[in-house]
């Protein structure tokens, strides 16, 4: 049959990328929600290990949510003097989602709680970078966010 396809070789994404002579880094993150603190720590450590003027390729399944979250975090790390709103607009204009998007309070859309968390955490990540980039991020995101979420809980 002319429409049959025979798989002659199967590779993981990592095998394919490394087979082309490139380096591969995967950071696990669940779709629709802000990454776990350990994933953000891993990303910050990865960022710190990068040489100057490196090219990176980011993607998730759809190329929007998680991709834009990590691109925004990378942009924040790379450009700490740029206002957060400018970074988020830039990432959106480049084709990503708007990470600080929040639906109206009366919305029944199932993703609303996740949007609220993302908007809160991208602002906190920006603040984390502002406070810690001068020390080379001696304080991990996990430690920093644990202390600041406790502060936020006390304020409520």
What annotation goes with each model-predicted range?
Residues 3, 15-57, 62-156:
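PTP/DSP superfamily signal
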């Amino acid at each position: 049959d002319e429409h049959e396809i025979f798989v002659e070789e199967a590779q993981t994404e990592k095998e394919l990328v490394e087979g082309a002579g490139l380096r591969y880094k995967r950071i696990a993150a669940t779709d629709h929600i802000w990454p776990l603190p350990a994933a953000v720590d891993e990303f910050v450590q990865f960022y710190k290990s990068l040489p100057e003027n490196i090219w990176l390729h980011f993607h998730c399944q759809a190329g929007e949510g998680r991709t834009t979250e990590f691109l925004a975090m990378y942009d924040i790390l790379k450009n700490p003097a740029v206002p957060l709103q400018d970074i988020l607009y830039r990432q959106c204009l480049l084709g990503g989602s708007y990470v600080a998007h929040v639906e109206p309070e009366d919305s029944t859309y199932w993703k609303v709680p996740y949007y609220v968390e993302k908007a809160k955490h991208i602002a906190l990540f920006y603040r984390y970078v502002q406070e810690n980039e001068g020390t080379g991020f001696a304080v991990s995101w996990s430690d920093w966010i644990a202390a600041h979420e406790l502060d936020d809980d006390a304020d409520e």
